[in-house]
């Protein structure tokens, strides 16, 4: 399956699937501080590390599909479209952490200022 376009629906699905399949290890914010770490398992790499922020989308899809290190394959549990949804959500997490106000369109900046 080719990578689908990123839509709100895809991001919503990605957030849901991330919460089920990824956050127990990677944590809700993708920092690598999921519940498994609290139980003594090794900490997975943070999605906010430079190496993963600069990795291409296919890397994340492949890791979900095939596993990596201590992470097992999720291919039997997560269909391809959901894998792409998770990838899109990981990118949203990364952007949310590393964005500046200049990345926000001017009309949205005004709304953010009003909300404060």
Task: Report the location of each language-model feature.
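A cross-kingdom signal targeting lumenal/periplasmic-facing segments of multi-pass membrane
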Residues: 7-13
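Long, soluble amphipathic alpha-helical coiled-coil "stalk/rod" segments that act as peripheral stators
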Residues: 60-63
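Membrane-embedded segments
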Residues: 15, 19-24
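Flexible coil segments in periplasmic/lumen-exposed cytochrome c-class electron-transfer proteins
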Residues: 1, 8, 19, 28-31, ...
């Amino acid at each position: 399956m080719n990578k689908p376009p990123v839509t709100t629906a895809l991001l919503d699905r990605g957030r849901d699937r991330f919460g089920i399949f990824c956050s127990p290890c990677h944590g809700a914010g993708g920092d690598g501080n999921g519940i498994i770490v609290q139980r003594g398992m090794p900490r997975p790499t943070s999605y906010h590390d430079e190496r993963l922020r600069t990795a291409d989308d296919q890397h994340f899809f492949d890791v979900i599909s095939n596993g990596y290190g201590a992470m097992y394959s999720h291919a039997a549990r997560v269909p391809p479209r959901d894998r792409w949804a998770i990838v899109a959500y990981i990118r949203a997490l990364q952007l949310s952490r590393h964005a500046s106000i200049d990345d926000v369109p001017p009309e949205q900046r005004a709304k953010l200022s009003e909300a404060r």
